[in-house]
Amino acid sequence: MARYFNALATLAIFAIFLKLGSLTSVINKLQISQQELAVGMGLATLGSLLGLQLFSLESTEHRHIPPIKLGVNLGGSVVPLLFLLFFFNQQSPQIQHVFILTALVTAVVYPMTRMDRQRGMVIYLFGAVVSAALGALMLDPKNYLVLAYSAAVLGTLIGGDLLHLPQLKKLTEMSNRTVFIGGGGVLDAIFLSGLMAMMTAETFQQMQFL
């Protein structure tokens, strides 16, 4: 039920951005063709069906508990990073700005992530999206779209997933012993945070929020 609600909420948010003109404006500013957009979303959707197991995490406290298997979902984690490389060809924010804002988003996302015995790591998007959007507009008003995307994706990946991996060992009662980074596919926080950060930044820019 929660998954369907998240899907509907995501569609509603994108519909709002479309109504405000933010989605169209982002596509135009990044000079993304309809063909490139279709290919990108196709890769993300197909990648969501593919998971690659990396290694296992043994519980340090309960040796009798089966290890938690850790993997990556290609659509939810790898494809957003490929998008990042593509976007860098459209705009080129300064690398130091990327590092600074990524560190900020990581610091915001980390405490807003909780461990769930059923689903593993649950990340709340609001902090990543808003901090990346506002930070990008302040640091680089020219290349704010790609800066917001980069910081949101990397900050969510690091603060929401990677830094919480040690805590997975403590979830001895998890019903699902396999956890995928980016496991939500196109509905995963890593994938959505970057897209929403760009559109939020564009909305703030149009409103002359800063």
Q: Where are each of the predicted segments found?
A:
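N-terminal topogenic module of multi-pass integral membrane proteins
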Residues: M1-E61
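A glycine-rich, hydrophobic loop/mini-helix early in the fold
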Residues: L46-I100
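Alpha-helical transmembrane segments and their membrane-interface exit regions
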Residues: L43-S48, A103-P111, V130-A133, A152-L162
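C-terminal transmembrane helix-loop-helix hairpin of multi-pass membrane proteins
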Residues: M1-I13, L30-V39, L125-F126, A133-L210
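Interfacial loop-to-helix junctions that mark the boundaries of transmembrane helices
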Residues: M1, I27-E36, P66-G71, Q91-I95, ...
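Cytoplasmic-side transmembrane-helix entry/capping segments in multi-pass membrane proteins
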Residues: Q35-A38, R63-N73, Q96-L101, R119-V130, ...
